[in-house]
Amino acid sequence: MKQLLIALVILTTTACGWHLRGITKLPATVQVMTLESQANTRFTERLKQQLIFNGVVFPSDASANVRLMIAPIHIERLTLSVNSRGQAAEYELNAELKVRLIQLEEGTDTEWNLSGRRIFSNDINSVIATQSEEKVQRQELENDLIRKLMNRLKKAQLK
């Protein structure tokens, strides 16, 4: 009976399309690629780790037909609101990432502009807490950009 219940739960979750977060089935055309990134090292390593986790292989030679080029991430911090004393009460982080997916043999070049936005409060009594929160929000913003890029790669129409 217990085995039947486990089998039923597994069938139900797979039939409804549920899957673990971060797992993206990428098309075969992007399973072997080279990665050229001008983004910061932390972002590049997390992106590479996510790609490897989803089955992408990075050959040591130049044999890959697909090249993924990542421009530097541009993150801008804006004051969103101020308190009654004229001090910043909330900040907004806006991120933009330019990505190019090039298929060398076919000569196709696809460019994407990915963006993200985060809002966080400014604790005027604790500068360290605000700096810590900004750091966390920047990391989450980068994670959002990686997820968006993985979704774009999933839907990439390459030959």
Name every feature range the model reports, one short phrase each.
Residues 29-74:
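N-terminal segment of the mature soluble domain
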